[in-house]
Every structure is written in structure tokens, then in C-alpha cells.
Amino acid sequence: MSLLEQVSVSKKANIYFDGKVASRSVFFADGSKQTLGVVQPGEYEFSTSQGEIMEVISGRFEVLLPETTTWQEFSEGTQFELAANVSFKIRNTAIAEYCCSYL
């Protein structure tokens, strides 16, 4: 979906990697949460504390999923799922955006 309705949005951004990755938390009436983020070109490693679905909103990412050795490409409109308590890497050569839904 390209529009989120009836939500509350955190004014303060979540800033990572010296400002190269930034996101905002979005809270829904049912108690669920998503983050909307922008990633500058680079390579980054993230860890999860709960399950996540990462949807690519614009651009593309190469992703090294947990327990794999091959980078996989995800472009606009695609998504990948992550378990809780894992680490994964992403890299991109141009600005890209994502929406993270928490499971």
C-alpha cells in the first residue's frame, strides 16, 4: 500500500550509521508498528529483535540474509522476511526506501 491512514508518527527520526540510514516509527490504532526508512548508498549490517518483513518502497537493495553466503537482489515492490534475533546485511548503490513491518 502506498498510503498509511489513521496513524501516529514519531517526530524524532531513528538515525543510524552517522545519518546514512534514517527511519520514522509509525503506530497504528491496533497497536502494530512499522518503520519507514531511507538508506543512502553503502553497506550496512542490522540485527532484529523481533520478526520483520522488509518491503522495498523505491530503489533496490542487495541483501545477505542470515545463514546465507549469496547476496540476493530486492527491488521496488518486493519484500523479504527476517526472524527475530538475527543479523543481516544490505547494500545499495543509490538512495533506496523501505517499509519495515514487525511480526
Curated annotation (Swiss-Prot):
Reaction(s) the record says it catalyses: a purine D-ribonucleoside + phosphate = a purine nucleobase + alpha-D-ribose 1-phosphate; adenosine + phosphate = alpha-D-ribose 1-phosphate + adenine; cytidine + phosphate = cytosine + alpha-D-ribose 1-phosphate; guanosine + phosphate = alpha-D-ribose 1-phosphate + guanine
InterPro entries for the chain: Ppnp, RmlC-like_jellyroll, RmlC_Cupin_sf
Keyword terms of this UniProt record: Glycosyltransferase, Transferase
Highest taxon of the lineage: Bacteria
Signal peptide region: none
Enzyme Commission number, as recorded: 2.4.2.1, 2.4.2.2
One annotated GO molecular function: purine-nucleoside phosphorylase activity
One cellular component term from this protein's GO annotations in UniProt: cytosol
HAMAP family: Nucleos_phosphorylase_PpnP
PANTHER family referenced in this protein's UniProt entry, alphabetically: PYRIMIDINE/PURINE NUCLEOSIDE PHOSPHORYLASE (PTHR36540), PYRIMIDINE_PURINE NUCLEOSIDE PHOSPHORYLASE (PTHR36540:SF1)
Its biological purpose: Catalyzes the phosphorolysis of diverse nucleosides, yielding D-ribose 1-phosphate and the respective free bases. Can use uridine, adenosine, guanosine, cytidine, thymidine, inosine and xanthosine as substrates. Also catalyzes the reverse reactions.
Similarity field: Belongs to the nucleoside phosphorylase PpnP family.
Listed name of the protein: Pyrimidine/purine nucleoside phosphorylase
Organism field: Shewanella baltica (strain OS195)
